[in-house]
């Protein structure tokens, strides 16, 4: 029975996370880019002005809302995860350095997709009976499309509830325990025999922390993420930039390999990665599933923002993809390629390849800092996905289930820390990909609304400046 379920899941998983999904996500990104006249490029300086230029202004959010900065930090908390460390390494190992180039291309289109998702989420959001803003794909499907499309909203929410326990929680907890166990073992603090006890303690501590944060509602979630996300991002960026600076003489060669490898991977990898398509597939998929543009999840957090301007919040979506993929994923790639660590092309690789890039430059002592970075990335992801799950289950059953859900979600951290539930997490990953289907249909059908909102936003700004 389990073998049959696993076989079915593998077929669906390969389809959802394979070429068809990439074609759909890239296709919708292209449609949105053309319809907005490549707004993500034309208005990029404006996007940075209304995001970076305003994010450190002290502002109190209204009751039941987050500040725009807290909203983007919560979205980044869920988006910037261990995939930024392990996923990029895997893309390079299988697709060669050229995969990085295609990752950039997917991010360029993903900026417009994420912009559209966030804009629609804020425009079509509602207030629940607790006075909180709620929004996301299920709400812009319900409030933006005709009634015969509403089943897609319930489908998205159901997929989301299933996904959060695996992709958003247990797999991230497993990453935390692995990182801590590895660091403690390397320093001789624990033996492998005592790891199970340590993991149980880690799981309990994480469960308590999660309960304290999530049960405090969106106010507390926003207060935590606005402090944690800038710290962890800056911490990782400084570590990675150090590697790049110390290997600055390799940077021109690395960028040459990235561009050449995008179109002729065999010339860069010694013939091991011979397929142009494989390089493109790995780069595009890493970009898409790192920044989550097309999945619609990030828009759930942005819908909580205390703002009256959907388009202005939409530019935080562009900023989010830029930070996640163009900055953090690119720095991870440069750490691996500039440090010249041995790469076995054609074979799967993960976080260990990225960590090797750090240790080759700094020495073994840095493994403790990379463990801290991985723990921060994973923990922030759990927090962000906790909010997503709460909003999805609330859409299905109402606000009365929020606190029970948050409590159960927190307890799952103990399960993730102590048990190996590989098949269950693989199924959750499949449902994560399935979330993209109803979202992409909705964003495509509502692309005209996005164009209209953008035009109205800039017409209003022009009149205000006149």
Where in this protein do the model-derived segments appear?
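N-terminal alpha-helical transmembrane segments of multi-pass membrane transport
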Residues: 1-82, 92-99, 110, 245, ...
